[in-house]
């Protein structure tokens, strides 16, 4: 009986310690969530980082919304996309609405010989924020060997989703390091957090963006440069082929308004509270369950697409 008493006391303290630890973890998580998703860090985004923001893929969707949001915060904006007509239109809209200076650079990120032109266009600018947003995905989920025009898709997706991030960072980062301030926001994807079969190349390129961002943040945060990996799930954009926004599929404007608050607070973010909850749940699923669910979903989407195109 006497020997059982110390054991009971030990178990009591183990239990009490566990409860206290869990309570602290929950309290910290709630505090962090309130700080990020409630209060945010909008005040840290603006000309204080540098006069200019540079946004790639800036004529539609998330990129356009970032350009507008940064202009709203008083930053001059360089818009970089493929279509000169669209660039001129968005540039005019931003100038008129936010009363800030804009510049445009028309290039196709599928090409590799564009970066001298971009370098010339950015010369002499004090760049505080770079948003690497330009990207491409699949037309529809497909098995790797059956992707139409596979050779071209491989080249384009690497150039647009990977090379652009590296080269734009190479152009802009030195000025930020020299001034000891700046932020690079790399738009990855929820598809980059875990493997997505039938979107294999896209998923892999977005994983690159995520890892590149995390590594770069560790390398340069001591030099005053904040690098963020943004991992959205579905947003109602042309790229995602979603027309109507919902709670879990927000408009680009809603998503960016939320994501901009996380700059300086989260170096890796889903950008939007509902997406953060989705990411937490998905990341904690056993991998075999997750892969089975995603494979079945994408097989269903593939079958629907092929049936629809066959009818047409």
Curated annotation (Swiss-Prot):
Tissue specificity as recorded in UniProt: Expressed in most tissues tested. Highly expressed in the ovary and mammary. Expressed in platelets.
Catalytic activity: a very-long-chain (3R)-3-hydroxyacyl-CoA + NADP(+) = a very-long-chain 3-oxoacyl-CoA + NADPH + H(+); 17beta-estradiol + NAD(+) = estrone + NADH + H(+); 17beta-estradiol + NADP(+) = estrone + NADPH + H(+); 3-oxooctadecanoyl-CoA + NADPH + H(+) = (3R)-hydroxyoctadecanoyl-CoA + NADP(+)
Topology term for the membrane: Multi-pass membrane protein
Catalytic-site annotation from UniProt: 202 (proton acceptor)
SUPFAM superfamilies in the record: NAD(P)-binding Rossmann-fold domains
Molecular function terms from GO: collagen binding; estradiol 17-beta-dehydrogenase [NAD(P)+] activity; fibronectin binding; heparin binding; oxidoreductase activity; very-long-chain 3-oxoacyl-CoA reductase activity
Binding locations of substrate: 189
Pathway: Lipid metabolism; fatty acid biosynthesis; Steroid biosynthesis; estrogen biosynthesis
The organism's place on the tree of life at top rank: Eukaryota
InterPro entries tied to this protein: NAD(P)-bd_dom_sf, Sc_DH/Rdtase_CS, SDR_fam, VLCFA-Steroid_DH
Swiss-Prot/TrEMBL keywords: Endoplasmic reticulum, Lipid biosynthesis, Lipid metabolism, Membrane, NADP, Oxidoreductase, Steroid biosynthesis, Transmembrane, Transmembrane helix
A Pfam short name: adh_short
GO biological process: estrogen biosynthetic process; extracellular matrix organization; fatty acid elongation, saturated fatty acid; long-chain fatty-acyl-CoA biosynthetic process; positive regulation of cell-substrate adhesion
Subcellular location as annotated: Endoplasmic reticulum membrane
Keyword Transmembrane helix on entry: yes
CDD domains recorded: 17beta-HSD1_like_SDR_c (cd05356)
Entry annotated with the keyword Chaperone: no
Annotated NADP(+) binding sites: 50-79
CC per GO annotation: endoplasmic reticulum; endoplasmic reticulum membrane; extracellular matrix; fatty acid elongase complex
Domain notes for this protein: The di-lysine motif confers endoplasmic reticulum localization for type I membrane proteins.
Assembly description: Interacts with ELOVL1 and LASS2.
Protein name: Very-long-chain 3-oxoacyl-CoA reductase
Species name: Homo sapiens (Human)
Gene of this entry: HSD17B12
């Amino acid at each position: 009986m006497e020997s059982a008493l110390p054991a009971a006391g030990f178990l009591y303290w183990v239990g009490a310690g566990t409860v206290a630890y869990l309570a602290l973890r929950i309290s910290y998580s709630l505090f962090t969530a309130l700080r990020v998703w409630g209060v945010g860090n909008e005040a840290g985004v603006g000309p204080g980082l540098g006069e200019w923001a540079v946004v790639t893929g800036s004529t539609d969707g998330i990129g356009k919304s970032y350009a507008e949001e940064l202009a709203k915060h008083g930053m001059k904006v360089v818009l970089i996309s493929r279509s000169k007509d669209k660039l001129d239109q968005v540039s005019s809209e931003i100038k008129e609405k936010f009363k800030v200076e804009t510049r445009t650079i028309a290039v196709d990120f599928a090409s590799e010989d564009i970066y001298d032109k971009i370098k010339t266009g950015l010369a002499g600018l004090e760049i505080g924020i770079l948003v690497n947003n330009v990207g491409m995905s699949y037309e529809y989920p497909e098995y790797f060997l059956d992707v139409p025009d596979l050779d071209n898709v491989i080249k384009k997706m690497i150039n647009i989703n990977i090379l652009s991030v590296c080269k734009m960072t190479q152009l802009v980062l030195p000025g930020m390091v020299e001034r000891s301030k700046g932020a690079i926001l790399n738009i990855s994807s929820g598809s980059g957090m875990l493997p997505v079969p039938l979107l294999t190349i896209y998923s892999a390129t977005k994983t690159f963006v995520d890892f590149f961002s995390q590594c770069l943040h560790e390398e340069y945060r001591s030099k005053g440069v904040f690098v963020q990996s943004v991992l959205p799930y579905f947003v109602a954009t042309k790229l995602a082929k979603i027309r109507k926004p919902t709670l879990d599929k927000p408009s680009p404007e809603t998503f960016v308004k939320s994501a901009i608050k996380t700059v300086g607070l989260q170096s890796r973010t889903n950008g939007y509270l509902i997406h953060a909850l989705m990411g937490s749940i998905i990341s904690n699923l056993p991998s075999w369950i997750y892969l089975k669910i995603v494979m079945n979903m994408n097989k269903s989407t593939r079958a629907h697409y092929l049936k629809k195109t066959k009818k047409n």
